Amino acid sequence: MKNVYIYCEGATEESFINEILYPYFFNAEIAVYPIICTTKRTANKKYKGGVSDKIKKELTTLCKQHHNEYVTTMFDYYAMPDNTPGLDCVEPDIHKRIKYIEHTIDADINQQNCSFHFMLHEFEGILFSKPDSFVLVANDDVVRHIHTISDSYPTPEHINNSPQTAPSKRLEALIPNYAKIKNGTLLSKDMGIDIIMERCPHFRGWIQKIISLGSAD
């Protein structure tokens, strides 16, 4: 059994890792463990260095503590500060751009066992992979609206990056009592990781990279 530590932003990601990713990877003889960062990002506060000095320090420490194991992240790309390493990339293809940014951050952190990963554009984006699952938490009109949003983009990872139209903002507007942790996990379980991977190529690449560790020496 190989261990992978996923440095993440909060309880929503922690629940997803424990309830969805852990059983999936366990079958590949990989155990994933969430580590919640202590630096909270908010809309009104941006930290120096984009991926802040504190995040970099915590992630570096984690990598050194587990130097023979793999460390990755589960951070929202949405609302990252402008001075995040690599964020000045002008590549129009979001999937190429995000890989460049992740590689730039990896170079900045400079730990061989670290692979930075962003959720495009945030965790809630992957929930648009299967709009029919929203019948569990919303009425038929809302489900139809979510279908319309999903159908308007090439992938759920393209649902865009503004305070009004980010995936979580859309869900909060459509479902006033939306509970991020509880509903996010419920919806993810219903749609299943295979559907999410099919619809979200950047997420799929991350999962496949972790899976590849199971066959590595």
Describe every region a protein language model picked out.
Residues G10-T12:
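Long alpha-helical, hydrophobic tracts
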